[in-house]
């Protein structure tokens, strides 16, 4: 088996992100992505296993981290004594929401893919992460 050429995966992912943003998952073409990246569809299949694997490689890291932020906020809130939770609910809700919104804007294109371009994937709803 040949060794992957350095920089090709990054080029594929850049071109894939553009194609998925432009056309959504269902209408995106691996041939177009490969041509734009200057490689072959075989190269994409060997690296990612196919279109769904490529889409997952783009969105899964950010989706998992987003979920971890959400869970972390919930866990911190649960550590507050139950009788004091009502006093801190607004603060935790606002701070947690801001953390999640900041993260989404820091990874805006990825969340565009999740919201607008994920139909046909396991990511069609954020809760499938």
PLM features per residue range, with description:
Residues 4, 8, 58, 85-92, ...:
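Conserved acidic
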Residues 91, 95-106, 119-129:
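Amphipathic alpha-helical packing segments from all-alpha helical-bundle domains
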Residues 1-5, 78:
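N-terminal intrinsically disordered/low-complexity leader segments
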Residues 15-22, 65-76, 110:
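Solvent-exposed, amphipathic alpha-helical segments
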Residues 57, 72-103:
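Hydrophobic alpha-helical connector segments
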Residues 11, 15, 19-53, 57:
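Helix-turn-helix
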Residues 56-65:
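Alpha-helical DNA-contacting segments of helix-turn-helix folds
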């Amino acid at each position: 088996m040949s060794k992957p050429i350095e920089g090709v995966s990054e080029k594929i992912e850049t071109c894939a992100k553009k194609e998925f943003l432009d056309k959504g998952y269902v209408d995106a073409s691996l041939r177009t992505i490969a041509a734009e990246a200057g490689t072959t569809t075989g190269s994409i299949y060997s690296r990612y296993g196919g279109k769904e694997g490529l889409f997952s490689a783009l969105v899964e890291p950010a989706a998992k981290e987003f979920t971890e932020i959400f869970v972390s906020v919930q866990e911190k809130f649960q550590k507050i004594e139950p009788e004091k939770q009502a006093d801190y609910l607004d603060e935790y809700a606002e701070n947690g929401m801001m953390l999640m919104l900041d993260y989404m804007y820091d990874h805006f294109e990825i969340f565009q893919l999740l919201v607008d371009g994920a139909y046909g994937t396991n990511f069609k709803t954020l809760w499938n992460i």
